[in-house]
């Protein structure tokens, strides 16, 4: 029983090393009882250790070749960027989105951004191979560089709206009078003219009994009787003008005619005259 368990243990240990060293497990096994290998001297090493050391040497050779290739690619990329004038300036010229006319405002308002120096060499990737020939996952992940955001200039309507929103509702008339010569547009409502006239008509009036006499006094409204007199004068002037313009409305103004005697010949005289005035007869007893 002890001998059978010893054979099973030795077979399992040999099978494990064959799997690690990449040997074919379908090959015929060694004849005879399997015994654990024994070392006769310090210089003698088992065959599986020799195979493992050979695999490690192959891994190191692969890593060195990959590092050399990546160094060559980094040098070629750096020379290409230097010939094009730097990747940052080239991308700024083609991807800024601003013309020469509108670009002045953006360049003046843009915050100073420190120019990132071009890296001398890219970080080298090391892909190590395991004993069985499969690539091992890298332990140190590559840190992602956050994109650089350029501040965009504000449009003219947005800047004016922020400027005028700071004013209170009752102070916009004063701002209109004080800043009337500025070129900034004033954002008002639909009934802005009515509000402006209403605020101007309701100016405060200083009392005659309070305060010192040296201050500026607002002009008081005229009494009611003065308003009535001005209305009567306006009506009289309108009536006189209407009377003066009555004769000018005709195509041929009337000529002054001598007074005719009140007799039978009056009607005949009126009929013989060529006046265009209508004949109005108050006394028709003679007809």
From Swiss-Prot:
Keywords: Cytoplasm, Nucleus. One of its GO terms (molecular function) is protein kinase binding. Its main location: nucleus. It holds the Pfam family FAM212. Residues 261-287 are annotated as: Inka box 2. InterPro entries: FAM212 (IPR029267), Inka (IPR039201). GO terms for cellular component: cytoplasm; nucleus. Gene3D superfamilies: Phosphorylase Kinase, domain 1 (3.30.200.20). It comes from the Eukaryota. Residues 168-205 are annotated as: Inka box 1. It is found in: Nucleus; Cytoplasm. Residues 138-147 have a biased composition (Low complexity). Residues 22-59, 138-157 are annotated as: Disordered. Residues 35-50 have a biased composition (Polar residues). Inhibitor of the serine/threonine-protein kinase PAK4. Acts by binding PAK4 in a substrate-like manner, inhibiting the protein kinase activity. Contains 2 Inka boxes (also named iBox or inca box). The Inka boxes bind and inhibit PAK4 by binding a substrate-like manner. Interacts with PAK4. Belongs to the INKA family. This is PAK4-inhibitor INKA1. The gene is INKA1.
């Amino acid at each position: 029983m002890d001998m059978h368990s010893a054979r099973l243990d030795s077979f399992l240990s040999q099978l494990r090393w064959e799997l690690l060293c990449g040997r074919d497990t379908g090959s015929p096994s060694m004849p005879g009882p399997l015994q654990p290998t024994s070392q006769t001297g310090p210089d003698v090493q088992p065959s599986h250790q020799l195979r493992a050391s050979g695999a490690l040497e192959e891994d190191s050779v692969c890593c060195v070749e990959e590092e050399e290739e990546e160094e060559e690619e980094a040098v070629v990329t750096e020379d290409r960027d230097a010939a094009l004038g730097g990747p940052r300036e080239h991308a700024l010229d083609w991807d800024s989105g601003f013309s020469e006319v509108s670009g002045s405002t953006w360049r003046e308002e843009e915050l100073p951004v420190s120019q990132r120096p071009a890296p001398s060499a890219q970080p080298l990737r090391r892909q190590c191979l395991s004993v069985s020939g499969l690539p091992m996952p890298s332990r140190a992940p590559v840190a992602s560089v956050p994109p650089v955001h350029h501040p965009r200039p504000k449009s003219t309507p947005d800047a004016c709206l922020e400027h005028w929103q700071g004013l209170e509702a009752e102070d916009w008339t004063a701002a209109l009078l004080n800043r009337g010569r500025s070129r900034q547009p004033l954002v008002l409502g639909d009934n802005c003219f009515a509000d402006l006239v209403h605020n101007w008509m309701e100016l405060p009036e200083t009392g005659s009994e309070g305060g010192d006499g040296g201050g500026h006094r607002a002009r008081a409204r005229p009494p009611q009787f003065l308003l009535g007199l001005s209305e009567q004068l306006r009506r009289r002037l309108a009536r006189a003008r209407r009377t003066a313009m009555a004769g000018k409305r005709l195509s041929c103004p009337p000529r002054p005619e001598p007074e005719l005697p009140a007799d039978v010949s009056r009607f005949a005289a009126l009929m013989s005259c060529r006046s265009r005035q209508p004949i109005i007869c108050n006394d028709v007893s003679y007809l």
